[in-house]
Design a protein with these regions (language model features):
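Active-site glycine/GP-rich loop and adjacent strand/helix microenvironment
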Residues: 243-245, 254-256, 378
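ATP-dependent carboxylate-amine ligase
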Residues: 1-34, 38, 42-49, 60-61, ...
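Acidic-glycine-rich active-site phosphate/pyrophosphate-binding loop
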Residues: 253-269
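Gly/Ser/Thr-rich loops at beta-strand to alpha-helix junctions
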Residues: 9-11, 71-72, 113-114, 224, ...
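Phosphate-binding loop of NTP-binding sites
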Residues: 19-23, 43, 56-60, 69, ...
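Short, polar loop motifs at secondary-structure junctions
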Residues: 32-35, 53-55, 69-73, 93, ...
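Short loop/edge segments at beta-strand edges and connector loops
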Residues: 51-53, 90-92, 136-138, 219-221, ...
Length: 447
């Protein structure tokens, strides 16, 4: 079989291409921007890449074109495919049909923590001799790659709710048919494709309706949104947990920053975790990962030992530099809840030392202004906050809600202010779901 992948350098599509090549399928593809590290990963797997979407690059003997969700009508390659009647399929459907068939799919979903939990579960399984397959939309420091076919029936996939393709507006995870599903949390996000939280709930409900009666849903029982989705119709087994109450499966932090915590079932302690991750969101991720692995048959002691050695995921409280008593961090947080827990975790770790937060309003939901009223409370743990936005109305709203928020329209504007800031014993954290114009290194070069 010979496939051609459109949008091949994206994390998901690039991982899919690697899996297909590992399966013995002949793979090539194209993308608008061909850049490291994905281009080198693909080339090392014998996958040829064309830059741009020139229809002339489409192999004449291709059996199937796999279309990424960044591809829209009007793309010259898509128009060529439609005009000539060439067979095409979405990435998630291809994955389901050709790579996940007869696998025990373990889907990690939710608004936050998908990459971290997927990485944790994969690490624990591999550490315990389970050669699982996996596809993760981020780079875990404990794993050699972001995707592997594996030989065991278990396949771990980061299952997001974003739409499948221009011709299939259902969420990607609809295609995966998991036997084990974690919904770690559920809030409004992706304002570019969802108009309300109800729209997102419908997609999660569609996912639950496709699960068999022998499948298992793992979820935090204190999350009202998830419970409301279940009330719409739920037919599988459930394994609830919580971080708010001391009943059933739950966790108790031992240290204020949650870098040490114990896991209980009712009143009986089952495991103790001591790791480098911090924050209550990390505690919940750890508890969820533990229960996913427990449901797959692993022993508590083995799970705890592996999780305690978890090194983390790139762009999750990543210390990118430590210079002149200033620590500079990079973090992917771009939703008020994730921002809040990230900054609270850092505050509990560093005590009274100064925290400066740089927040780029980059995601579609953040740019829409939907979260403007929540941002001031989310960043309250920081001493000083610089919001990067060019929306004057948004800036006015944010500055009026908090005395420690200051606006910057560009990274250069902030860098000009840098020399006037008191930086001794400071933790400077940059929050964005993009590259932030390389501001982390620019700061380190100037201090």
């Amino acid at each position: 079989m010979k496939i051609y992948v459109l949008g091949i350098c994206g994390t998901f599509m690039g991982g899919l291409a690697q899996l297909a090549a590992e399966k013995g399928i002949k793979v090539s593809g194209c993308d608008e921007n061909v850049y490291p590290p994905m281009d080198q990963v693909l080339l090392s797997n014998g996958i040829a890449i064309d830059e741009g979407y020139n229809p002339k690059n489409l192999p004449k003997d291709v059996d199937l074109v796999v279309v990424g969700n960044v591809i829209a009508r009007g793309n010259p390659m898509i128009e060529e495919i439609l005009n000539k009647g060439i067979d095409f399929i979405s990435g998630p459907e291809f994955l389901s049909k050709y790579l996940l068939a007869k696998r025990h799919v373990v889907a990690i979903s939710g608004t936050h923590g998908k990459t971290s939990v997927s990485s944790m579960v994969t690490k624990v399984l591999l550490d315990n001799g389970v050669d699982c397959g996996y596809l993760i939309a981020g780079r875990a420091k404990d794993l050699e790659a972001t995707a592997s076919l594996g030989t065991h029936e278990f396949f771990i996939i980061e299952a997001d709710e974003y739409d499948t393709a221009f011709f299939d507006k259902r969420s990607k995870f609809i295609h995966y048919h998991p036997k084990t599903l974690l919904i770690n949390n559920l809030e409004f996000d992706h304002a570019d494709i969802f108009s309300s939280l109800s729209d997102i709930k419908k997609q999660f409900h569609h996912l639950l309706r496709l699960m068999s009666s022998t499948s298992t849903l793992i979820f935090p029982e204190h999350n009202i949104n998830i419970k409301n989705v279940m009330k719409m119709g739920f037919y599988s087994q459930s394994l609830p947990f919580n971080t708010k109450f001391t009943r059933g499966w739950h966790a108790k932090k031992v240290t204020a920053d949650s870098s040490k915590f114990d896991i209980y079932k009712d009143n009986k302690k089952k495991a103790s975790i001591s790791w480098s991750s911090i924050g209550e969101h990390s505690l919940q991720n750890g508890l969820a990962s533990y229960l996913v692995c427990k449901s797959l048959g692993l022993k508590s002691k083995d799970i705890a030992e592996s999780l305690s050695e978890f090194k983390g995921v790139t762009r999750r409280m990543d210390l990118v530099g430590d210079k002149s008593s200033v620590k500079v961090y990079d973090d992917f947080a771009h939703h008020p809840t994730a921002i809040k827990y990230t900054l609270e975790g850092l505050r509990k770790k560093v005590g009274s030392e100064k925290i400066i937060c740089l927040l780029e309003m980059r995601s579609n939901t953040m740019l829409s202004g939907y979260h403007d009223k929540k941002i001031p409370k989310a960043v309250a743990s920081a001493d000083q906050v610089f919001i990067f936005s060019k929306d004057k109305k948004q800036i006015s709203t944010l500055e009026s809600e908090s005395n420690n928020i200051e606006a910057c329209s560009t990274t250069q504007e902030f860098l000009r202010k840098l020399s006037s800031l008191e930086l001794e014993n400071t933790h400077l954290i940059c929050l964005s779901n993009g590259s932030f114009d390389g501001i982390h290194q620019a700061i380190l070069e100037r201090i």
